[in-house]
Amino acid sequence: MAKVIVYDEYTNRLFTYNLSENDPMPYAYGNTMRVREFRGSSNSPTLWTTTRAMEAWNLTRRRYGKGIYIGYAFKRIWEGGHGTASQHYAGVSFDVGQNVSYSQRVAIRNAAVATGAWGYVEPISMTPTWVHFDRRYGTPACSGTTAGYPTVRRGSRSTYVLILLDALNALGYTNRPLDGIFGGGTENAVRAVQRAVSLTADGICGCNTWKKLTAASVGIGRTRTVID
């Protein structure tokens, strides 16, 4: 069984589903994406994504017209496998098409671009043996880039808050449940991180705080303070 948390950007709410590995992902139409496919190589019992990521998948799948193999999707930040600001940790990124021909990957990429639903579709020249697309959302905290995570603060709700909570727990700054809600305890934990790395302790996770926190937590493995 897996616990799947879905953030709905339209209502700013998070919903939790308890599903088996062969169940369809919430909001994915038909059986086009099962929990085990979204999980990929992650060993986490808890997964998360957004309604808009699933909608983008649905549009791409319909436009392409047949099955799309998913090589990698979800990862928790302490599991690593991707960069320090990867959208895979937010549950909105997919690396697909590893088992088909180059021409078929081009067709998948073209379908993804044509939907206009993804925040980013990687050029085929950068990923010639797979297709990458993600449904990033929010304005990146660091200026001059379209990558990275948005600023989150007390009252924020999102899968980016889930990344923050997961990193704080893994590093032992807090033991908050993974609910995707930035509350007072999370604010205090962010201040503790900021003090530890000589940043202004304002309790807001912006550009520099994200950089320090993700660099310290990405790929460190499951620690004794990780919470599922």
Regions found by a protein language model. Give the residues of each.
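Surface-exposed helix-capping loop/turn segments at secondary-structure junctions
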Residues: 66-68, 173-177
